[in-house]
Amino acid sequence: MAKVQYMGTGRRKEAVARVRLVPGEGKVVINKRSAEDYFGLETLRFIVNQPLNLTGTKGKFDVLVNVHGGGFTGQAGAIRHGISRALLKADETLKGELKKAGFLTRDPRMKERKKYGLKKARRAPQFSKR
């Protein structure tokens, strides 16, 4: 077990990510798989790496993530949120740029509930005049 590690919890939609930052060479491990294996899309890997690229800490920390719930986009957002919070614990001076980029803010947008009488949250059944 590493002597120095920084923890952060990130959330987005239904996804929850528990992130550990350990001084290392920049490996990202998500649910015991590499980020390249876990996220097929390049955009999702980009979202995960945004806080590290912004703060210039890309090669300084190994990122160990446990994430569950939600879909791939929600999980990527949760991981970004968790990494940002862990970086803040590692170095308080990064708060300004992380906050300005919006990485410390929990995205409040959630799925809207389905209403009775409708097919989905807002989609009404087809209407026929005659």
UniProtKB/Swiss-Prot annotation:
Pfam families (alphabetical): Ribosomal_S9
InterPro entries from the UniProt entry: Ribosomal_Su5_D2-typ_SF, Ribosomal_uS9, Ribosomal_uS9_bac/plastid, Ribosomal_uS9_CS, Ribsml_uS5_D2-typ_fold_subgr
UniProt keywords, alphabetically: Ribonucleoprotein, Ribosomal protein
GO terms (BP aspect): translation
Annotated Gene Ontology cellular component terms: cytosolic small ribosomal subunit
Composition skew (Basic residues), residue ranges: 111-130
Gene3D superfamilies: 3.30.230.10
Chain residue ranges for the region called Disordered: 106-130
Molecular function terms, GO-annotated: RNA binding; structural constituent of ribosome
Family annotation (HAMAP family): Ribosomal_uS9_B
Assigned protein family: Belongs to the universal ribosomal protein uS9 family.
Record-linked NCBIfam families: PRK00132.1
Protein name in the entry: Small ribosomal subunit protein uS9
Organism of this sequence: Clostridium acetobutylicum (strain ATCC 824 / DSM 792 / JCM 1419 / IAM 19013 / LMG 5710 / NBRC 13948 / NRRL B-527 / VKM B-1787 / 2291 / W)
High-level lineage: Bacteria, Bacillati, Bacillota, Clostridia, Eubacteriales
